[in-house]
Amino acid sequence: MENVKVENLLINYKTLEKFKRFREYGNQELTMMEDLENNIIENDSKSPFYGIYFGNNLIARMSLYEVSKQYDYYFEPSQDYLTLWKLEVLPDYQNKGYGEVLVNFAKSFELPIKTNPRINSHGFWEKMGFIKAHYEMERDLGENPLIWLPEGVKEKDMKS
């Protein structure tokens, strides 16, 4: 996976067109088009969307949001963390390491990461070093989040 570059995707109509390919292949719950449409403002605004291009084609993408320390109910010590949403690789490019490249890019920020895996993807996330967060009904609201803990960080004990 040398020379594979993760790019911050611009929030514009050109990116919206590229996202349409994912809607053709993916599940409705993974589509980021609505997210992008809601974020189309200026080309230079900070985009939460990241992707990998193969030639001129966007072949893999994810959303990565930074959550402020004041809303941290997952990690000890409390700190800013990342929420990784909607990681998706087009079918022709799956099982070639592109998803791993995106996750490793997120890990490079050296912040804890939370994700809510979809579509039988737990095996992938476990391979990437994510663990199941202890379920807390009020916090998790029916989701089953997985978390990644960088060195020196542990899961918050919600009982205390």
Curated annotation (Swiss-Prot):
The keyword Glycosyltransferase appears for this protein: no
Organism in which the protein naturally occurs: Oceanobacillus iheyensis (strain DSM 14371 / CIP 107618 / JCM 11309 / KCTC 3954 / HTE831)
Pfam families, per database record: Acetyltransf_1
GO molecular function list: acyltransferase activity, transferring groups other than amino-acyl groups
UniProt keyword list: Acyltransferase, Transferase
Record flagged with keyword Acyltransferase: yes
Protein name listed in UniProt: Uncharacterized N-acetyltransferase OB1458
Residues in N-acetyltransferase domain copies: 9-151
PROSITE patterns membership: GNAT (PS51186)
E.C. code: 2.3.1.-
Record lineage: Bacteria, Bacillati, Bacillota, Bacilli, Bacillales
